[in-house]
Amino acid sequence: MKKQDSYIYFVGIDCAQNKHDFAVINDQKKFLIKKGHFSNTLQGYEKFLKTVLSKCLNKDKILFGMEVTGIYGTNLYERLASEGYHVVIISPDSVKKYRDYKGLNKTDKIDSTCIAELLLKGDAQLVDIQKKRIY
């Protein structure tokens, strides 16, 4: 995937059964949120989106990226996509390779920051479910 210049904000999400970890980085490589999390519920989603939108001033300039890990992110993906956000799925292998390259341990918080950085750099192969194409 090549970095898409139309985005300013990159939201990396590591999905799990009960809670999701997330990080937000901007196109200037500054983390706006480095260690966020929210419960895998409607109320958690609403809190998450409110938090993200409080840091990202233009919702049309946000790219959300989620690591593919079973079914835990399905509702989140569908909700974001149905609200018109651009959401892409990244493979766990891409995250692992990047994390290993940086010499980092495996944690959900670290994975969410790695996902955000990969989105910014455009270094991962992503599957865009909305448009059914591979970058």
Identify the meaning behind each predicted range.
Residues 1-135:
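Phosphate- and other anionic-substrate recognition elements at nucleic-acid/protein interfaces
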